[in-house]
């Protein structure tokens, strides 16, 4: 949007209920930089890039979570941004950890009760080749049929994992794969959530009475994970 990054932080982030228990001056420890992850050098000024070389930890959680973006747009949002950030990370000599927040759904559906391992998901072709096909305008239906992914979101998150691992060099990379993130179990307080994305909207519609019944499978498992457990895992990745 047109609202400056610093202003959005002050009005939308700093006032969030999840930070209410922190000291009143906690924001003095936060430096907001205006940039663009989709641009080379993250769209940052030379001075801001120099500032970032001192960071010790990078958490990359930015992404487009839209399931129906054209593959080329999803790749710009989820793959190229990740590679731009990795390039910046290589210039951070004090870096201790680069955490990439992925998704449990990088593994396409393979039938009931097939174990999902903490390894890269096999691809039908090298990740760089698949990305080149996306950038060249290959039809979405062709890409999804080839890889088994149900949508361009999971496909591009999967390719981002592969390319980060392949190109990380000496960057200390960790990947965290949460499933559907939902309300907090304990922190900042039980039930806290500030987003209607994902399961939050579903619960809100049920609670308000707008959604009275849904077709479901009583044997199916709903893959939800509390947001505070996800943040703890990211912090210790």
Where are each of the predicted segments found?
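Short loop/turn segments at strand-loop or loop-helix junctions that form parts
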Residues: 1, 35, 58-63
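Active-site loop/turn elements of alpha/beta-hydrolase fold enzymes
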Residues: 1, 37, 103, 178
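Short, charged/polar "capping" segments at the starts of alpha-helices
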Residues: 2-8
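Conserved Rossmann-fold cofactor-binding substructure of NAD(P)-dependent oxidoreductases
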Residues: 14-57
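A structural motif corresponding to the C-terminal end of an alpha-helix
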Residues: 24-30, 88-95, 160-172
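Conserved Rossmann-fold NAD(P)-dependent oxidoreductase catalytic core, especially the SDR/UDP-sugar
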Residues: 53, 57-62, 68-76, 80-155, ...
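NAD(P)-dependent short-chain dehydrogenase/reductase
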Residues: 114-137, 152-154, 158, 162-223, ...
């Amino acid at each position: 949007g047109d609202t400056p990054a610093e202003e959005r932080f002050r009005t939308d982030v700093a006032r969030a209920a999840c930070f209410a228990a922190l000291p009143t001056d906690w924001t003095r420890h936060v430096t907001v930089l205006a940039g663009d992850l989709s641009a080379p050098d993250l769209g940052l000024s030379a001075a801001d890039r120099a500032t970032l070389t001192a960071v010790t930890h990078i958490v990359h959680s930015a992404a487009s979570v839209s399931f129906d973006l054209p593959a080329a747009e999803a790749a710009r949002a989820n793959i190229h941004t990740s590679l731009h950030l990795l390039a910046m990370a290589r210039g951070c000599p004090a870096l201790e950890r680069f955490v990439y927040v992925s998704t449990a759904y990088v593994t396409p559906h393979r039938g009931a009760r097939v174990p999902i391992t903490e390894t890269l998901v096999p691809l039908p072709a090298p990740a760089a080749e698949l990305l080149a096909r996306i950038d060249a305008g290959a039809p979405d239906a062709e890409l999804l049929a080839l890889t088994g992914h149900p949508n361009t979101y999971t496909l591009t998150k999967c390719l981002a994992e592969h390319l980060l691992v392949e190109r990380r060099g000496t960057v200390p990379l960790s990947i965290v794969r949460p499933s559907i993130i939902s309300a907090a179990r304990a922190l900042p307080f039980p039930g806290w959530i500030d987003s209607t994305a994902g399961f939050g909207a579903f619960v809100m519609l049920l609670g308000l009475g707008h959604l009275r019944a849904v077709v479901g499978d009583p044997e199916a498992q709903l893959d939800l994970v509390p947001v505070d457990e996800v943040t703890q895992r990211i912090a210790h990745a």
